[in-house]
């Protein structure tokens, strides 16, 4: 993996990632394809919205279809017919979300499969092996996602376990498996700056190809998340990619880019589309609202996606009211293209030196003031 920093405006960065299956321009949003499919999208649709990289999930693919099936296809790329880069989440977050169904020990995590109730064991080594079989371009370490809220003591204990696991992940990925693909560390520590520092410094000692901010978007108020983003990205290596996991709303992504984050993923655009909530240049359209029954305009006049070029809001309203599958499909195409256009717009503005104007326009269209952002002297 190679990461080049191509430009900067304040803390916002313009970069380029070169991976085994292609080049990724940053800032970038990665559509989530948990089970080896982005819900409601054909692989050609994902190409049409100009996604450069997608996300798969180690935990779910390990349970179904299992490694043997994917091995027979020579990896996840051939299995799902996607020839561009793939990042895989290690499974740590999914194990965290199982709650009482899991037991965490030093060796790893034992849990009941949410599919058939059978006992399953996941460890740092097993996670690395699964992701090696998947042939992920970016492999994430197996960690414990610190819950919110957590006391200082709980968050510290959790991050120290994650650091010991991180060391095992690196050893297995590099030394045992000889995997040449990128391996990213994940910073934990809850909402405590001293613990975030401890986690980051521990990961830097081990050494990774990129660094992710974990443990956000887990139920904390937005102010708490912004507080972490005010200080943490700027402490992360300036010559490595920075990834904010599981975030988020368009405003959250803009604010994180302003603070120096490069990569994002979130289920929000796909999930919201299935509920008739569409992201547009001026904010949000809730298509089930009866005011759209006779609306002859496109969903977003500024959008170049298949949905906006071909269908009216009235038609989308009709599909939603009828409970038609096509409503979710067209909505997902649009929402994911919106997120790609958002990050494209930021890249373009960073290239042209007009990033501040981009941010002003983004908020002005929503009738909002630009929030404050830390400035380096």
Swiss-Prot record:
InterPro entries the UniProt entry points to: ArchSynthase1/Queuine_TRR (IPR050076), TGT (IPR004803), TGT-like_sf (IPR036511), tRNA_ribo_trans-like (IPR002616)
Annotated pathway: tRNA modification; tRNA-queuosine biosynthesis
Chain positions recorded as Zn(2+) binding sites: 303, 305, 308, 334
Keywords: Glycosyltransferase, Metal-binding, Queuosine biosynthesis, Transferase, tRNA processing, Zinc
Cofactor binding description: Binds 1 zinc ion per subunit.
Catalytic activity, EC: 2.4.2.29
Parts of the chain that traverse the membrane: none
Binding positions for substrate per the UniProt entry: 89-93, 143, 188, 215
Region ranges (RNA binding): 246-252, 270-274
Domain of life: Bacteria
Cofactor names: Zn(2+)
Catalytic center residues: 89 (proton acceptor), 265 (nucleophile)
Catalytic activity as recorded in UniProt: 7-aminomethyl-7-carbaguanine + guanosine(34) in tRNA = 7-aminomethyl-7-carbaguanosine(34) in tRNA + guanine
Recorded GO CC terms: cytosol
An example molecular function term from Gene Ontology annotations: tRNA-guanosine(34) queuine transglycosylase activity
Keyword Zinc: yes
GO-annotated biological processes: queuosine biosynthetic process; tRNA wobble guanine modification; tRNA-guanine transglycosylation
UniProt function note: Catalyzes the base-exchange of a guanine (G) residue with the queuine precursor 7-aminomethyl-7-deazaguanine (PreQ1) at position 34 (anticodon wobble position) in tRNAs with GU(N) anticodons (tRNA-Asp, -Asn, -His and -Tyr). Catalysis occurs through a double-displacement mechanism. The nucleophile active site attacks the C1' of nucleotide 34 to detach the guanine base from the RNA, forming a covalent enzyme-RNA intermediate. The proton acceptor active site deprotonates the incoming PreQ1, allowing a nucleophilic attack on the C1' of the ribose to form the product.
UniProt cross-references to HAMAP family, sorted A to Z: Q_tRNA_Tgt
Summary of subunit composition and partner proteins: Homodimer. Within each dimer, one monomer is responsible for RNA recognition and catalysis, while the other monomer binds to the replacement base PreQ1.
Family: Belongs to the queuine tRNA-ribosyltransferase family.
Name this protein carries in UniProt: Queuine tRNA-ribosyltransferase
Species assigned in the record: Acinetobacter baumannii (strain SDF)
Gene responsible for this protein: tgt
């Amino acid at each position: 993996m190679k990461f080049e920093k191509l430009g900067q405006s304040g803390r916002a960065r313009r970069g380029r990632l070169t991976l085994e299956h292609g080049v990724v321009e940053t800032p970038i949003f990665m559509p989530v394809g948990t089970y080896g499919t982005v819900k409601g999208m054909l692989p050609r649709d994902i190409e049409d919205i100009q996604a450069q990289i997608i996300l798969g999930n180690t935990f779910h693919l390990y349970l179904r279809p299992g490694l043997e099936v994917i091995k027979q296809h020579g990896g996840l790329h051939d299995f799902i017919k996607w020839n561009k880069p793939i990042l895989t989440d290690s499974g740590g977050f999914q194990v965290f979300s199982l709650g009482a169904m899991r037991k965490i020990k030093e060796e790893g995590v034992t849990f009941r499969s949410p599919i058939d109730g059978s006992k399953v064991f996941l460890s740092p080594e097993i996670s690395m092996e699964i992701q090696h079989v998947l042939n992920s371009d970016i492999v994430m370490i197996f960690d414990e996602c610190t819950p919110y809220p957590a006391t200082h003591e709980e968050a510290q204990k959790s991050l120290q376990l994650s650091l010991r696991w991180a060391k095992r992940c690196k050893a297995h990925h590099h030394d045992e498996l000889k995997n040449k693909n990128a391996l990213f560390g994940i910073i934990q520590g809850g909402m405590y700056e001293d613990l975030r520092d401890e986690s980051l410094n521990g990961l830097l000692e081990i050494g990774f190809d990129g660094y992710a901010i974990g443990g956000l978007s887990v139920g904390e108020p937005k102010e708490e998340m912004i507080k972490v983003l005010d200080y943490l990205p700027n402490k992360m290596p300036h010559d490595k990619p920075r990834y904010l996991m599981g975030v988020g709303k368009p405003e959250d992504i803009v604010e994180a880019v302003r603070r120096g984050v490069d990569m994002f993923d979130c289920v929000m655009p796909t999930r919201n589309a299935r509920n008739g909530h569409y992201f547009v240049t001026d904010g949000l359209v809730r298509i089930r609202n009866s005011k759209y029954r006779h609306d002859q305009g496109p969903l977003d006049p500024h959008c170049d996606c298949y949905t906006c070029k071909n269908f009216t809001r009235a038609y989308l309203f009709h599909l939603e009211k009828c409970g038609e599958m096509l409503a979710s499909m067209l909505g997902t195409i649009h929402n994911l293209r919106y997120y790609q256009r958002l990050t494209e717009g930021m890249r373009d503005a960073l290239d042209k030196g007009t990033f501040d104007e981009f941010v002003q326009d983004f908020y002005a269209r929503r009738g909002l003031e630009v929030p404050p952002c830390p400035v380096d002297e």
